[in-house]
């Protein structure tokens, strides 16, 4: 019954086994809000664990310090589990986290029950470092530490940064793109998150307009963020970028490719753009024809 009341987005999130595990530990009255990402779920769960520690006669500070110590040691060693002996934490705090099923102990080795939980706490570290104005490489890590596992932590950090403030997200992303000390598949995370934004705000819109022709990463933005995504192509059209590119022989093909990539999902303004430029050049008309589907049932009245 509770599951059926959840939003579609949350149901989709819970298809991931580790997310479902976390959700099952949450108080049901807490889960119908905005917990729409893995980060939200983990944050709510740990808040709940800390809150309930008081009823067990423990101080929240003890629980938080135990968690911090575990994360510290795992980060320094680069491991998912570490010997209990080297943690040097209060036994009561560790036992409580184990009984809460967020931490596990096997053969005297301690770690979090799922790697996504460690990833989230590591992404929190990155957020703290960012607001303490640390260097880019100190936040993400040196190249030798830019592993696939670290990539997911950076992804969580960037998603949380975007949620906090899109301007900070853009500033940090631009630093990543121009840095020689960041691997490309880490830079690509920035493109991925941009591509997932359905309703770009003013900061995102301005970034796209200012950088779609950037000499360093303009083509990457076109291919990985703008292409096939109507929300971004609409921005370029509304700001006159498509019109300008159409007037430039060397860029005209980009306009054709962008419009074709969102067909048949063309709106009235897209069709008006095509109408303004159609029937003036046979070669251009052949390119515009790519926006028309062979299946007429999918075409709009405006396109006809």
What are these regions (language model features)?
Residues 79, 106, 124-304:
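Extended amphipathic alpha-helical scaffold segments
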Residues 1-144:
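Extended hydrophobic
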